[in-house]
């Protein structure tokens, strides 16, 4: 049983956080496009970023900021222009964005983190951003998390939010999160934009370690289309407003906090896969019997990212051969004669041998998952046991539909 409970809210559920989201005119659609997360006190900040060699200005800016000072008061997010591949002017725009917000909040620019999402190669519409800063700050509210979550969306169909609460030393500690991501999602860092807030007190180094480990198990295990973005960023702020004793080393309290952080990240990661562009269902790949956990995660990622597996799921075809083929090319050694593959409750292969199974029933299982979009029953569970060791790992993805091609043919990225 989990040591925490789900509560109402999102990034503003922890004490001392406010948020806002407005329409500043950055998007041609007129949808909300400027978001702000704000801590009333200086918060410990941790970050994980894209591994792409082509990076947005905000990524390089925040890397430098966190290396110099692992704390922050505010996160400014613009949606509509990625500000990636924009050269020196893109960098200057990022710097100016931080300075404008700092001036409006009356805090240091060094206390501001930035994130951008949208079309690669397009600079931020700075005139609209300049005009939007004041109303954005004026919109800050303790219940502004929902608006902030909507203002970071691009091709997303739904906002992605969560809030959890636990007890540490007899005092309530809360953690909240929001994320965006629907396309250009592939496990190679944080795979999208995600923001986590917490009111626990924790040391800088430990908070970064916790976030990095949580990312490996969650966001790095998500794939929608095999493309890694130029802008992937994950930030976690912990402001200590719960007034619990500072957590400075691993122990029961640290383990509880890290487990809750991992749960928040996993929820957001699954929400991203569930909302994959054109997706009709979520795929969860559970791999056991691997040489070690890292190997298990690699096999799970490969299966989740296989276009053939994803297409079979969309076609409601219980094609175990595609699952076996993907497992075999994951770069992990195992004896194929030990392979077990299950689709839901249907055993398709055991001891490396294909089995007779209820094919119409298995196909109907896939159809039912597609009809339960955005519900708990929308998950297609694929279980693979390599029969080699005790390693285990999970990855998440989605099916590949005709709509994915249509969306990305029509949408400039």
From Swiss-Prot:
Enzyme Commission number(s) of this protein: 2.3.1.35, 2.3.1.1
Subcellular location: Cytoplasm
Reaction(s) this enzyme catalyzes, per UniProt: N(2)-acetyl-L-ornithine + L-glutamate = N-acetyl-L-glutamate + L-ornithine; L-glutamate + acetyl-CoA = N-acetyl-L-glutamate + CoA + H(+)
Main location: cytoplasm
Record InterPro entries: Arg_biosynth_ArgJ, ArgJ-like_dom_sf, ArgJ_beta_C
Example of a GO MF term: L-glutamate N-acetyltransferase activity
GO biological process: L-arginine biosynthetic process; ornithine biosynthetic process
Name under which the protein is recorded: Arginine biosynthesis bifunctional protein ArgJ
